[in-house]
């Protein structure tokens, strides 16, 4: 009996040691981090007001005051299409034009049951750009019901293009960014 107990304990210890020390290089570099909205340019002047809280808990931002160039992706963790296309946005954000801030990326999480559900989604997919939340459904008038929806907004706050539905491959997303902002990714 002692022998079997010793084998079981040794096996459990080895399993714990091996799994806790292994790394998963497929995970995004920032898994577990909820980005701040501090880098958003919300300096635009607008007579409209649509206050949305940042998912990092740092406060509210008036959506109508955000200036681009910026890609705004409306998503929800419950949305199958959002889960499908999110790796494309993660890839897009790795591009130098996004990394150096020439073009910004903003997520808007809608229709969640709680903030934590959205935070968990961000952590799971490694979404390292700022995200606003709309638990109350205030953005339905602006974005329409459902997700995903992606907007392309210029430096003056003008909507250049709107894509309704799921991106089926990264090239489709990258091409729309290039056309909207006149850049080469």
Residue ranges and their predicted role:
Residues 120-127, 133-185:
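Thiol/disulfide oxidoreductase modules built on the thioredoxin-like
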């Amino acid at each position: 009996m002692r022998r079997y107990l010793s084998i079981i304990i040794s096996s459990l210890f080895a399993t714990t040691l091996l799994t806790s020390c292994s790394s998963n290089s497929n995970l995004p570099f920032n898994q577990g981090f909820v980005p701040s909205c501090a880098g958003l340019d919300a300096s635009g002047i607008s007579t409209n007001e649509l206050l949305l809280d940042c998912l990092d808990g740092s406060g509210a931002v008036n959506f109508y005051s955000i200036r681009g160039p910026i890609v705004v992706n409306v998503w929800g963790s419950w949305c199958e299409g959002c889960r499908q296309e999110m790796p494309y946005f993660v890839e897009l954000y790795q591009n130098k034009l996004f990394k150096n801030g020439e073009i910004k990326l903003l997520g808007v999480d809608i229709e969640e049951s709680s903030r934590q559900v959205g935070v968990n989604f961000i952590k799971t997919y490694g979404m390292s750009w700022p995200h606003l939340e709309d638990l109350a459904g205030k953005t339905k008038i602006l974005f329409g019901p459902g997700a995903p929806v992606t907007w392309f907004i210029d430096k003056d706050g003008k909507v250049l293009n709107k894509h309704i539905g799921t991106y089926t491959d990264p090239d489709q997303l990258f091409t729309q960014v290039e056309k909207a902002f006149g850049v080469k990714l």
